[in-house]
């Protein structure tokens, strides 16, 4: 197990993550305390954030040719 030092950064306490523990491509972390542990994990989008995503094309659910045949299937 590795250890890191805690230092003061203004009014906050901080640590430096070792390079091999970097969250590559992540700009925001969620921090949670569980007992005597502190867990860092990437912030996940909320369901509400889907409203801001680009909408699907109008023909997204249009009739399309079946690409999988029913051959070999049986009725339940």
From Swiss-Prot:
InterPro entries: Anti_VapB2-like, SpoVT-AbrB_dom, SpoVT-AbrB_sf, VapB_TA_antitoxins. Disulfide bonds: none annotated. Residues 4-45 form the SpoVT-AbrB domain. GO terms for molecular function: DNA binding. The keyword DNA-binding applies. Gene3D superfamilies: 2.10.260.10. Keywords: DNA-binding, Plasmid, Virulence. Belongs to the VapB family. This is Virulence-associated protein VagC. The lineage of its organism: Bacteria, Pseudomonadati, Pseudomonadota, Gammaproteobacteria, Enterobacterales.
């Amino acid at each position: 197990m590795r250890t890191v030092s805690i230092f003061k950064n203004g009014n906050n306490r901080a640590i430096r993550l070792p390079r091999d523990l970097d969250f590559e491509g992540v700009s925001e972390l969620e921090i949670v305390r569980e007992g005597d542990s502190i867990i860092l994990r990437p912030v996940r989008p909320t369901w509400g954030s889907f409203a801001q995503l680009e909408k699907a094309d109008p023909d997204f659910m249009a009739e399309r040719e079946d690409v999988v045949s029913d051959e070999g299937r049986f009725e339940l």
